[in-house]
Regions:
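Short, glycine-rich nucleotide/cofactor-binding loops
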Residues: 5-19, 50-51
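Histidine-anchored nucleotide/phosphate-binding helix
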Residues: 18-32, 37
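Anion (oxyanion) recognition and catalysis
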Residues: 29-30, 71, 110
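Short internal beta-strands
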Residues: 35-40, 77-81
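Short beta-alpha junction loops
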Residues: 41-44, 84
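N-terminal beta-loop-helix "entrance" segment that forms/cooperates
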Residues: 43-57
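A glycine-rich helix N-cap at a beta->alpha junction
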Residues: 53-81
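C-terminal structural segments of small proteins and small subunits
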Residues: 86-111, 116-118
Length: 118
């Protein structure tokens, strides 16, 4: 099965787009192959402890449930290092299972054959 990389730049600024990224990610993570969600810009706050509290797009499940389902299905959660540095975020700020990853780390995943969804 093909590995999948999903790039998500949306968080509380557009909860609907953020929700869709985690819904697609959760479905992909439940399949064979690896799925990584690369969070950039506002989306990095979704990996922050308590960063999804109270966040829910109209008609969608709460963001904390979508993130938890993604993680429970074996999804990989990467936070853009440049974005984290710009916002003063460290590994201690992240939910369990999330990690800060630089561009090289993410591009290696693509070089190894991952398909990219934006």
């Amino acid at each position: 099965m093909t590995n999948i990389l999903i790039n998500n730049a949306f968080g509380s600024d557009n909860p609907e787009k953020a929700s869709v990224a985690f819904i697609v990610g959760g479905a992909s993570a439940a399949r064979d192959g690896e799925t990584a969600l690369f969070l950039t810009s506002e989306a990095i706050n979704l990996a922050r402890k308590n960063g999804t509290n109270g966040l829910q797009a109209d008609g969608y499940k709460p963001m904390d449930e979508l993130v938890q389902t993604y993680m429970d299905n074996g999804g990989i959660l990467w936070v853009c290092k440049a974005c984290a540095d710009a916002k003063g975020m460290t590994a201690d700020d992240l939910i369990d299972g999330a990690e800060i990853a630089g561009a090289g780390h993410t591009l290696s995943f693509v070089d190894d054959g991952a398909q990219v969804l934006m």
